[in-house]
Amino acid sequence: MLNQVSVLIVEDEPFIALDLATAVEEARGKVIGPAGSVREARMLIEQHLVQAAVLDVNLSDRDVTPIAELLIKDGVPVIFYSGLALPVALRERYPSASAYTKPTPPVELLNKLVALMLK
């Protein structure tokens, strides 16, 4: 399904991050991360070619907005994945953003990522 696409996972809950990483690998994608903070995510973005991303909204150090802005500016398909609804500020800034609440099955997220990459 993913054919070696590099997917950045930004998620601070270890079990959820593991589920996402496993799903990416099973779909024949390459996992970048997971990153549990904005700082970690920035380092990974500097070190790797990110072709798609699944972003938790609230991380251990702050919200994911700086990472989302960086990736979206570069045309990287992004899915927000949060325990809560997407914050108003992010929804207003990115009205067409794909946002899912936990516990959406990882395969559903990956199907949406593939659809976004084909646009």
Locate each region found by the language model.
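Non-catalytic signal-transmission and effector/linker regions of two-component phosphorelay proteins
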Residues: 1-6, 39, 91, 101-119
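Conserved acidic carboxylate
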Residues: 11
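Two-component/phosphorelay signaling modules centered on CheY-like receiver
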Residues: 14-33
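Acidic, metal-coordinating helix/loop segments flanking the phosphotransfer/catalytic sites
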Residues: 34-52
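Active-site residues of response regulator receiver
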Residues: 56
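The feature encodes the CheY-like receiver
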Residues: 60
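Alpha4 helix (beta4-alpha4-beta5 surface) of REC/receiver domains from two-component response regulators
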Residues: 66, 73, 84-102, 107-111
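Hydrophobic/aromatic residues positioned on beta-strands within the core alpha/beta folds
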Residues: 79-81
